[in-house]
Amino acid sequence: MTADNNTEALDSSTTKDVIQKGISVVGDLLGVVGFPFGGALVSFYTNFLNTIWPSEDPWKAFMEQVEALMDQKIADYAKNKALAELQGLQNNVEDYVSALSSWQKNPAAPFRNPHSQGRIRELFSQAESHFRNSMPSFAISGYEVLFLTTYAQAANTHLFLLKDAQIYGEEWGYEKEDIAEFYKRQLKLTQEYTDHCVKWYNVGLDKLRGSSYESWVNFNRYRREMTLTVLDLIALFPLYDVRLYPKEVKTELTRDVLTDPIVGVNNLRGYGTTFSNIENYIRKPHLFDYLHRIQFHTRFQPGYYGNDSFNYWSGNYVSTRPSIGSNDIITSPFYGNKSSEPVQNLEFNGEKVYRAVANTNLAVWPSAVYSGVTKVEFSQYNDQTDEASTQTYDSKRNVGAVSWDSIDQLPPETTDEPLEKGYSHQLNYVMCFLMQGSRGTIPVLTWTHKSVDFFNMIDSKKITQLALTKSTNLGSGTSVVKGPGFTGGDILRRTSPGQISTLRVNITAPLSQRYRVRIHYASTSQITFTLSLDGAPFNQYYFDKTINKGDTLTYNSFNLASFSTPFELSGNNLQIGVTGLSAGDKVYIDKIEFIPVN
């Protein structure tokens, strides 16, 4: 089986379950990252173990998911060795979590004696060393891509475990030197695990590049599913550093994922567009925006028998906005074919569209098959009023049957809540691609993670991370470029001195609340960052180069530019400028962090 015809092998409940587990783990982590964890730490461990370690089955499913995507099998010896290691790790982690739970429940001195300290140190060290010794079993030569989801989940558990030495090490009786050694190890492994995941994600993606529409569908499935189970996870690794993040962290994932085209591969009979046409046509790296309006165009498709004629979604415009409170409306180019029927406008204006359910139909002629999307119901949620509702595009002629549901590919974060609360992704863009021979259009929907805050609210209690791609506008000479894979989204790049961007922020705390700022950056030269509020400079400092010209961006390419002077957010528009760049230099900017100062 080749990449061009492997698409249908992935349609299974197993794949949906694997994706749901990956989404659930990331969602749980987003709720607890940063310190102090308090009682939430043991609760997280318990939920995590129940999600991925109720048995060995989830780990088998992680492996089978990538095997199906790559159309390749892991050798029995390698799979059996990995599963045996995972069983041992499960035993070690469960023993440690049980001891940690008892430790937290019994703060009195009689319980926390040298014996109990020694016991929890022993269990922690056993679990931690077992991870170090087991990780090579999830990176066996020739199977690195197939083990990648397993590797990422195991790496996440190891790093999350390691940070406990910084929280409890002194209580447990570790010497300061031992605690420092654990911290050094955590930093080293964060870099090692992150770079491994990015490298082998890209290797797998490149292997799936093809020429046909069918190969693009499989390529995009790999990109989407590995984003959900690997790249989203590694974006959170730095937040386990409790020395850098001594408070809870409010963060978000701004990357896009594309669901499968609504028109199924089997219905196209070779009439889909080409791999390069669809890949070159999808959105390039861009400033983050949210869905405002879709204008649907409709055409009539006659059928050979007459009664199989139907209307279909033939094209669309999309309108978006950069952030809540902005009056700017960005209108897309037109996608598809213009309407021969009245257009339909659906306006969302910031409500979270968390599900799309589509109807399709076919018209069969002796020489061809014509396929089209006839109806789409969009479920949306207003998180300000706590109300759910639906809007529908309806072609109003022979709409056929439901054949596509976004939840099958982007399952909810949790099933313990109604879908409008437990959903994982929200719609932010739609496109249409023309089939070959003018046989209809292929709609494709783009989604972003529910963690994104459309208001850019700065929390007065937590460290707030905002991606600089959420800027409302860019300085001349600044561009949005593809992220390196571990940042949770795209990043900004500048090659000359000047203003990088303007970021609109909002606060609910009193204006007297002060903050410090850090910028996550990579630079080929020593630079000076200048911060201004509504045009008035308030912070300026120089920072070291982090990379050489021509270097590929890896985890250690980035550093944190920390400003020590606290300030009050007396304005809404934050400008970031840079000087110190010469010809050939580049500075990359990922996120800005706002740290509340008491």
Predicted features and spans:
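Membrane-inserting hydrophobic helices used for pore formation or membrane fusion
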Residues: 109-448
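Extracytoplasmic
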Residues: 331-337, 341-598
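Intrinsically disordered terminal tails
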Residues: 8-11, 15-19, 480, 566-571
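Membrane-inserting effector segments that mediate pore formation, membrane fusion
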Residues: 10-74
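Membrane-active, amphipathic/fusogenic segments and juxtamembrane/transmembrane anchors
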Residues: 1-9
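Heptad-repeat coiled-coil amphipathic alpha-helices that mediate oligomerization/assembly
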Residues: 50-107
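Long, contiguous hydrophobic alpha-helical segments, chiefly transmembrane helices and signal peptides
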Residues: 45, 70, 154-155, 517
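Short amphipathic alpha-helical segments that mediate assembly, nucleic-acid/protein binding
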Residues: 15-22, 59-63, 79, 93, ...
